[in-house]
Amino acid sequence: MKYLLVEPKVKSIAPNIALMKWATWCERNNHEFEYVKGNIRPSIQPDVILMSCIFSFYSRKYGETIRHYRNLFPKAKIIVGGAFPSNMPEWFEQFPYVEIHHGLSEEIESLPPKYSIDKKNKKIITYASRGCVNKCGYCTVPKLEGDMKSFQSIKETLEYGLKEIPDATGVVLYDNNFTAHEYFDNIVDELRDFGLPVDIHGLHVSDFTEHHAQRFAELKWGAQHENGTAYNRFSFDFVGYEKHVKRALELSEKYKIKAGFFCYLLFNWKDSPHDFWKRIILSQRMVDEVGRTVFLFPQRFEPLNSLERNNYIGDKWNDDLVRGVVKLYTFMHGFIPLTTTRNIFRWIGYSYEEFLDNVIKFSTVRGYRLNKKSGEPPSTDSLY
């Protein structure tokens, strides 16, 4: 059998781990395979086409890719998997020749990814767990992956990854909630002993304890970015998380974890602009009290069934406010850095009224970004 592994050409910050695992499956079962990205003409004549579809708002691109390969190989079996078809199988009914794979395959999940199919990737990217203990209303994980399943060891995957990428620069875990991992200590031991810089996604502030901080201090951080920048990624999605966020920040400083403190700020969901602004202010207060920089990354909410990106406006928001917030953090190169100097607030606003005023003005301007040489934002005079 010949398998064509298709990754649609959409914006992505990481290689497609699912297709890498399928490549390993093909190799171990003596099936010929080819991995492609985008709508091209592959070198093989496939019997089966496996396609990964993650985000619903790329539906148009996915449709184009399905039609492209159907036209090239009308006799091939087409199977699509991922979050989008698992959440919205009805959308794929327009393609009666397409078979949908729902959720995760235990057989495939147990395999290490074949990293070498992506020649540009230099990181060992994997999971130490799937699923999550939480059931957040804005997240697809509970439906796609189910209850949390912790893997007792990732040593085999790490060693396999190093064989695939001898010059690997780091290890990245894309877990949803690593702080709730059943075998947390064992995984940290393996990461520490492996020796490469690490980056771990999915750290929940409500689960973060002194023990987590102590163990994280043992790790070498900085796998995600080529310049060695490292972050511990938390989220501050609701004002009620304040005490948890502050506790995590205090522990990070106490144990001198060598990674920046990074917080996602969900907005445009059930929150209001005032709620969003208040989380920024509360974060700054924590910075002042603890003395550790916090990097805020606003995350615009997208409904799980959205077929187009950036069209949804929350009940308590409007288009100008959402667009202004997006431009505000885009102009700061993607995040809002909070330091004890408070310099950033002359750009954001020192009161809620100033914040609203600046956000509305940001929604109408173009071309401003943080000055890379000086590290200072442009004068707010240029926005008036």
Give the ranges of each region predicted by the language model.
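Glycine-rich beta-alpha loop elements in corrinoid/cobalamin-binding modules
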Residues: 2-123
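Canonical Radical SAM [4Fe-4S] cluster-binding loop centered on the CxxxCxxC motif
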Residues: 17-18, 119-160
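A general structural detector for well-ordered alpha-helical segments in enzyme core domains, enriched
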Residues: 22, 61-69, 157, 186-187, ...
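Conserved, mostly hydrophobic/aromatic
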Residues: 26, 132, 136, 173, ...
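Conserved acidic residues
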Residues: 46-50, 98, 137, 169, ...
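A short helix->loop->beta-strand "cap" motif at the edges of active sites that frequently abuts
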Residues: 71-77, 196, 257-259, 292
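A structural motif corresponding to the C-terminal lobe/cap of the Radical SAM core domain
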Residues: 221-384
